[in-house]
């Protein structure tokens, strides 16, 4: 068989060697550690993960040895059936990460190793699937890890539960309420560096989706005497040290505080201000951030810290006796700070601290206090201020956690998960009223545990007729009755002493106890003890034999602490406080209430009874915490201490009940309702009795006789694996049913949707057919009318406009315009135009002219300046030569060039001679002499003022435009032209005969430059020119086959030019 290995997030390797024999290997820091729960050798080393699997389950030694083995291997969790036993390791084991949470989420209880997260997930799934309120009860001695377990549970729910619709604010507040309550309610004791000095029960509300949507906290009996007194090696509440160590300098200056705790009387009595395991500075940052998360405003934080600082200043108030031995305040500076921080009148506070107000026969009298009484009043005020502030703080947190959607349907379907973190059983060298109340609370919780697990389970078996061998256990009801019994209990006797007239003292209370309960087996005093016991019992002490062991209590302070007396004038002073928190803590209605308030013990007893009712209304889960040693050292296993805790927690009795009993029981109706889908005969409904239906169901599931029993109203299943197998089958069945339901629903949904679409389609079709029919009829009617009007108009089309032909004429006009719009000319050369009807001829002509003008305007707007100049020159050429000179048509498609000679082709001497005159145009020409007509190469330059004829580097002739009288050219295709100058100009030798290959271009540019457009003469036959003073020359032009220029015999210049017939 192949070996399969699986590595899980905790570092364990699961080797599957047999389908029913899982084998685990865990990798530890000290090498490879094998934990094979099914192998004998591994079990000998790490023990079993469920005490139910112990072979010698009745042996206390075997039980403790199993704890030792697992503790040695850092396996701090072990089951007793569904009960989790946790041993405090006093160090971080790295087993609470997100990976661990995911490993335990949604997994059956016994499919994974024991863990607090397994209990958390089981409780959460029961809350969601069965819709029943749940409670996790965490119990154990002080320092056993109860508070840490509560925090881990909250962390698990915050990380793994779905987020509510309105975000994760509730989850954050649930988590952040812990550091705030710990700061104000926890302190270092001899046994625990973070001991809860109050009891806490938290309800977390979940909506139907399983998301946390709200919460509520109940607090019980804050140990307010710790504010003014601490035993040696203990500290006051954390908040005082955190504020001094972590507060900003400005904050401390405003509060009048200094960082040294030794400066405050209330912080030095335990002589333990600094603790290496506590970082007050970092804890302060956590608390400060948490206050913001739970909706504290900056003003509220400032008011709260003012109250905390006022308690420290109260402790530093000192008194001195005057001549009459009455107390007087001697620390004015502290009083000044108190007055400002508490926002009260200084004189009123001074008087309240040194006097007591007494009302006698309707009159108010002030009685001065001696030094002892003034110190008592000061400490009473400090305790009252702090304890009431703590109560206000819990209320503030509850308002922050309250669900905001109480009217929504999802809120009405919420379920509640309760977390109980109560102070553990305490036995100190000096035990007082607070330890008495705390241990009484633990007795009540132990009694509830017995009721819900041991006693109720055995009674249930008997009531259901299940064969059962009774398990003997110690029922601590006798101790609870000793404390709380009406008229005869310790609390009743204490209240009676506190309320009776006369001089009642702690010793008279002890004497009355001795008289009333002297025969009780769990009560002992010095007077009632034998000679040997009296050595360990003082005269002012009594001893109770609790379920957890013997505890000796000193009666000193019992009456004062139970009365919780605060002088009336101190109450009046605090009621006048302008501090918003103080004004809520001290209500003025207290002053007018004549009824004596209930004592502290009675209030605590009533609140415990209420707590027990709350827990009894929920489905409980148990975490039993064990402290391995008193020194808080990791790895140390104190067998004597652990044996004591195992005994008083009743773990062995719980194990024996679990081994002899059944793991699961449920009423027939509920069981059938949950699992009926697994059997075809019971699904979907069962018509007979529920008991018969369950019998059919378990037979179908294949339960063996030893796996279950049928009671009178319930079915009992012995083994968890049987229930897990049933749950697995149900999960598979649910998937199948869900698929069928989804298919049926989808079919129904889409069928309904199809029918709706079909009805809509029929309606739309009907409406559309009617609309089309009406449109068609209207169209036909309109067409008939239109045809009738057109025919009538056509008949009268030549008549003047009248109602009969107006429609036809308008139609004709419209048709013509629409047709014209489609057939408009595309350019100015396009002369096409649709033939208009007779009535539109005038309008058509106007439109044609507008169209042409528009096209011309668009064309002109689109051309560049260079092209515009080109067109202008071409237009001038056309005006001069079109139809008059044979070679003009050949020049039309050729663009005129700005110049035919570059500046590099013109001599620099010529340019220098011209000076600043720019050359507008230059072209090479041939000049003919005036006498012999000899041709000579020249350059013709046009400037803004003259025509310049250049020979190489010499200006031969300059003709100003003013002296240019005209230009002559023949009508043939030759390229000769004559520039005529004034005869009176002595500077000129006569007219100039020139020849240019670009004669049209040259003459056009010359005419434009000289402004002689109208001075160009196009001659036919001959041109006469001035050849010099008193002498004329003639040029004869005759058509021929080719161009020929010669001097004729008659002395004329004969030019033969071919006719191109292009004109």
Swiss-Prot record:
Sites where Phosphoserine occurs are at 408, 536, 864, 1041
- Please list the residues that carry the modification N6-acetyllysine: 486
Tell me any Pfam family this protein matches. Myosin_head
Which residue positions does N6-methyllysine occur at?
383
Q: Does the keyword Acetylation apply?
A: yes
GO CC aspect terms? actin cytoskeleton; B-WICH complex; basal plasma membrane; brush border; cell cortex; cytoplasm; cytoplasmic vesicle membrane; cytosol
Q: Where is the IQ domain?
A: 734-757, 758-786
Identify the residues that the record assigns to the TH1 domain, covering every copy: 885-1059
Residues bound to ATP: 88, 96, 139-148, 192-196
> Which InterPro entries does the entry mention?
IQ_motif_EF-hand-BS, Kinesin_motor_dom_sf, Myosin_head_motor_dom-like, Myosin_TH1, MYSc_Myo1, P-loop_NTPase
- Any one Gene Ontology molecular-function term assigned to this protein's record: ATP binding
Where in the cell?
A: Cytoplasm; Nucleus; Cytoplasm, Cell cortex; Cell projection, Stereocilium membrane
Myosin motor domain boundaries: 47-731
UniProt PTM comment: Isoform 2 contains a N-acetylmethionine at position 1.
Q: Which domain of life is it from?
A: Eukaryota
Q: Which UniProt keywords apply?
A: Acetylation, Actin-binding, ATP-binding, Calmodulin-binding, Cell membrane, Cell projection, Cytoplasm, Cytoplasmic vesicle, Membrane, Methylation, Motor protein, Myosin, Nucleotide-binding, Nucleus, Phosphoprotein, Repeat
Which parts of this chain are annotated as the region Actin-binding? 608-630
The function of this protein is: Myosins are actin-based motor molecules with ATPase activity. Unconventional myosins serve in intracellular movements. Their highly divergent tails are presumed to bind to membranous compartments, which would be moved relative to actin filaments. Involved in glucose transporter recycling in response to insulin by regulating movement of intracellular GLUT4-containing vesicles to the plasma membrane. Component of the hair cell's (the sensory cells of the inner ear) adaptation-motor complex.
Of which family is this protein a member?
A: Belongs to the TRAFAC class myosin-kinesin ATPase superfamily. Myosin family.
State the domain notes. Binds directly to large unilamellar vesicles (LUVs) containing phosphatidylinositol 4,5-bisphosphate (PIP2) or inositol 1,4,5-trisphosphate (InsP3). The PIP2-binding site corresponds to the myosin tail domain (PH-like) present in its tail domain.
Q: Give the record's subunit note.
A: Interacts (via its IQ motifs) with CABP1 and CIB1; the interaction with CABP1 and CIB1 is calcium-dependent. Interacts (via tail domain) with PLEKHB1 (via PH domain); the interaction is not affected by the presence or absence of calcium and CALM. Interacts with POLR1A. Interacts with POLR2A. Component of the B-WICH complex, at least composed of SMARCA5/SNF2H, BAZ1B/WSTF, SF3B1, DEK, MYO1C, ERCC6, MYBBP1A and DDX21. Interacts (via its IQ motifs) with CALM; this precludes interaction with YWHAB. Interacts with YWHAB; this precludes interaction with CALM. Interacts with RPS6.
Q: Which PANTHER family match?
A: MYOSIN, UNCONVENTIONAL MYOSIN-IC
Q: What is this protein called?
A: Unconventional myosin-Ic
């Amino acid at each position: 068989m192949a070996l399969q290995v699986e590595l899980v997030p905790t570092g364990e390797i699961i080797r599957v060697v047999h389908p029913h024999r899982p084998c685990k290997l865990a990798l530890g820091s000290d090498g490879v550690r094998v934990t094979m729960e099914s192998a004998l050798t591994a079990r000998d080393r790490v023990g079993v993960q469920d005490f139910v699997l112990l072979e010698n389950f009745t042996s206390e030694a075997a039980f403790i040895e199993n704890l030792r083995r697992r503790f040695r291997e850092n396996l701090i969790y072990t089951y007793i059936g569904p009960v989790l036993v946790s041993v405090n390791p006093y160090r971080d084991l790295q087993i609470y990460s997100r990976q661990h949470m995911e490993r335990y989420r949604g997994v059956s209880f016994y499919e994974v190793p024991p863990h607090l997260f397994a209990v958390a997930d089981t409780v959460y799934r029961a809350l969601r699937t069965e819709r029943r309120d749940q409670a996790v009860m965490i119990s154990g001695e002080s320092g056993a890890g109860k508070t840490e377990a509560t925090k881990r549970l909250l962390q698990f729910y915050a990380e793994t539960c779905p987020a509510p619709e309105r975000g994760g604010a509730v989850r954050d507040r649930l988590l952040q309420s812990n550091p705030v309550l710990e700061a104000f309610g926890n302190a270092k004791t001899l046994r625990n560096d973070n001991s809860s000095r109050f009891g806490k029960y938290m309800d977390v509300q979940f909506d139907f989706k399983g998301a946390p949507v709200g919460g509520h906290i109940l607090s019980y009996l804050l140990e307010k005497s710790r504010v003014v007194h601490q035993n040696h090696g203990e500290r006051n509440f954390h908040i005082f040290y955190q504020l001094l160590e972590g507060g900003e300098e400005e904050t401390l200056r405003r509060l009048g505080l200094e960082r040294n705790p030794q400066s405050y009387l209330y912080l030095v009595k335990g002589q333990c201000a600094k603790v290496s395991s506590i970082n007050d500075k970092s804890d302060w940052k956590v608390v400060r951030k948490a206050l913001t998360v739970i909706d504290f405003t900056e003003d509220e934080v400032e008011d709260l810290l003012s109250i905390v600082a006022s308690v420290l200043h109260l402790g530093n108030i000192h008194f001195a006796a005057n001549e009459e031995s009455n107390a007087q305040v001697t620390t004015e500076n502290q009083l000044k700070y108190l007055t400002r921080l508490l926002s009260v009148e200084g004189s009123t506070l001074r008087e309240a601290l040194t006097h007591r107000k007494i009302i006698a026969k309707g009159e108010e009298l002030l009685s001065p206090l001696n030094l002892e009484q003034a110190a008592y009043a000061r400490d009473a005020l400090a305790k009252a201020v702090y304890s009431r502030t703590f109560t206000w703080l819990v209320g503030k947190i509850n308002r922050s956690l309250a669900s905001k959607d109480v009217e929504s349907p999802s809120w009405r379907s919420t379920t509640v998960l309760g977390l109980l973190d109560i102070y553990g059983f305490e036995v100190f060298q000096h035990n007082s009223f607070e330890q008495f109340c705390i241990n009484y609370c633990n007795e009540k919780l132990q009694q509830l545990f017995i009721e819900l697990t041991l006693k109720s389970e055995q009674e249930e078996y008997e009531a259901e007729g299940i064969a059962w061998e009774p398990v003997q256990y110690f029922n601590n009801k006798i101790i609870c009755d000793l404390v709380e019994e009406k008229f005869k209990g310790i609390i009743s006797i204490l209240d009676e002493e506190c309320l009776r007239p006369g001089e009642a003292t702690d010793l008279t209370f002890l004497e009355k106890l001795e008289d009333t309960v002297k025969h009780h087996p769990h009560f002992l005093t010095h007077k009632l003890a034998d000679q040997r016991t009296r050595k360990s019992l003082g005269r002012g002490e009594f001893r109770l034999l609790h379920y957890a062991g013997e505890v000796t209590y000193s009666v000193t302070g019992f009456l004062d602490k139970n009365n919780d007396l605060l002088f009336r004038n101190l109450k009046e002073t605090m009621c006048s406080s302008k501090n918003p928190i103080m004004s809520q803590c001290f209500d003025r209605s207290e002053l007018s209430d004549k009824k004596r308030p209930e004592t502290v013990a009675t209030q605590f007893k009533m609140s415990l009874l209420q707590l027990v009712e709350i827990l009894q209304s929920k489905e409980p889960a148990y975490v039993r915490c064990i402290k391995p040693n008193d020194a808080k050292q990791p790895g140390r296993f104190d067998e004597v201490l652990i044996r004591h805790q195992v005994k008083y927690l009743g773990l062995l009795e719980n194990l024996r009940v679990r081994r002899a009993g059944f793991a699961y029981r449920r009423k027939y109706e509920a069981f059938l309702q949950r699992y009926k889908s697994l059997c075809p005969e019971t699904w979907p409904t069962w018509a007979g009795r529920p008991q018969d239906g369950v019998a059919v169901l378990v037979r179908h599931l294949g339960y063996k006789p030893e796996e279950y029993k049928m009671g009178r109203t319930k079915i009992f299943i012995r083994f968890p694996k049987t229930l897990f197998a049933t749950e697995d089958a149900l999960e598979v069945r649910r998937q199948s049913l869900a698929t069928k339901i989804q298919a049926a629903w989808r079919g129904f949904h889409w069928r309904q949707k199809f029918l709706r679409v079909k009805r809509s389609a029929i309606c739309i079709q009907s409406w559309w057919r009617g609309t089309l029919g009406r449109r068609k009829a209207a169209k036909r009617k309109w067409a008939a009318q239109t045809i009738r009007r057109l025919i009538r108009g056509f008949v009268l089309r030549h008549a003047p406009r009248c109602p009969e032909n107006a429609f036809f004429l308008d139609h004709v006009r419209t048709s013509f315009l629409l047709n014209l719009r489609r057939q408009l000319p595309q350019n100015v050369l396009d002369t096409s135009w649709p033939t208009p009807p007779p009535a539109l001829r005038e309008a058509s002509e106007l439109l044609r002219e507008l169209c042409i003008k528009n096209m011309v305007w668009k064309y002109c707007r689109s051309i560049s300046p260079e092209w515009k100049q080109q067109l202008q020159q071409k237009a001038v050429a056309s005006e001069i030569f079109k139809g008059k000179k044979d070679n003009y048509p050949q020049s039309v498609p050729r663009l005129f060039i700005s110049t035919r000679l570059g500046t590099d082709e013109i001599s620099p001497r010529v340019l220098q001679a011209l000076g600043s005159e720019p050359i507008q145009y230059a072209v090479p020409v041939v000049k003919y002499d005036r006498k012999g007509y000899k041709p000579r190469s020249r350059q013709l330059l046009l400037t803004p003022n003259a025509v310049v004829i250049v020979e190489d580097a010499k200006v031969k002739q300059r003709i100003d435009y003013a002296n240019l009288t005209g230009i002559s050219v023949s009508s043939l295709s030759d390229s000769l032209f004559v520039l005529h100058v004034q005869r009176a100009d002595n500077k000129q030798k006569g007219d100039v005969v020139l020849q240019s290959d670009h004669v049209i271009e040259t003459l056009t540019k010359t005419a434009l430059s000289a402004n002689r457009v109208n001075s160009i003469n196009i001659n036919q036959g001959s041109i006469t020119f001035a050849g010099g003073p008193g002498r004329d020359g003639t040029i004869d032009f005759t058509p021929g086959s080719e161009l020929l220029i010669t001097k004729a015999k008659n002395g004329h210049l004969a030019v033969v030019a071919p006719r191109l017939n292009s004109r």
